[in-house]
From Swiss-Prot:
Quaternary structure and partners: Component of the RNA polymerase I (Pol I) and RNA polymerase III (Pol III) complexes consisting of 14 and 17 subunits, respectively.
Compartment(s) where it occurs, according to its Swiss-Prot or TrEMBL record: Nucleus
UniProt entry keywords in alphabetical sequence: DNA-directed RNA polymerase, Nucleus, Transcription
GO MF annotation, one: DNA-directed RNA polymerase activity
Annotated S-S bridges: none
InterPro entries for the chain: RBP11-like (IPR036603), RBP11-like_dimer (IPR009025), RNA_pol_Rpb11_13-16kDa_CS (IPR008193), RNAP_AC19 (IPR033898), Rpo11-like (IPR022905)
Function (record text): DNA-dependent RNA polymerase catalyzes the transcription of DNA into RNA using the four ribonucleoside triphosphates as substrates. Common core component of RNA polymerases I and III which synthesize ribosomal RNA precursors and small RNAs, such as 5S rRNA and tRNAs, respectively.
Protein's name in the database: DNA-directed RNA polymerases I and III subunit rpc19
UniProt-listed Pfam families: RNA_pol_L_2
Biological process terms in GO annotation: transcription by RNA polymerase I; transcription by RNA polymerase III; transcription elongation by RNA polymerase I
Protein family membership: Belongs to the archaeal Rpo11/eukaryotic RPB11/RPC19 RNA polymerase subunit family.
Species this chain originates from: Dictyostelium discoideum
GO CC terms of this entry: RNA polymerase I complex; RNA polymerase III complex
Record gene name: rpc19
Length: 116
């Protein structure tokens, strides 16, 4: 299953993902709603570490971890386990939104400092 075809994520996913992003580059391997592995194609430690960081700041997330299976493999595996009141897909979407908000804040702060 891909992120685009995931039933719980489709509507909320489309609200913030830029049109240029290929949602088919994320494959979902789900054991249960609260526990899933997401396989990102063409992503590396940059996104993996950032997602892991923001996910672990979320009190509804019990576990987050990522791995790059092999340096020559262009995949990043992200495992998320949540508490029962939120799904792994919802926490991933929240994490991506948090990264977007943090990036926007850094960009605006940097530009404001340049203007002074």
């Amino acid at each position: 299953m891909t992120l685009a075809s995931a039933p719980a994520a489709t509507e909320s996913c489309n609200s913030f993902i830029p049109p240029s992003f290929d949602v088919n580059k994320v494959e979902i391997i789900s054991d249960r709603p609260d526990c899933a592995t997401f396989i990102f194609t063409d992503e590396d430690h940059t996104l993996g570490n950032a997602l892991h960081y923001v996910l672990m700041k979320n009190p509804k997330v019990d576990f987050s971890g990522y791995s790059i299976p092999h340096p020559s493999d262009n995949r990043m595996n992200l495992r998320i386990q949540t508490k029962s009141n939120i799904t792994a897909q919802e926490s991933l979407l929240q994490g991506l939104t948090d990264i977007k908000d943090i990036s926007r804040h850094i960009f605006e702060t940097f530009n404001n400092a340049l203007d002074q």
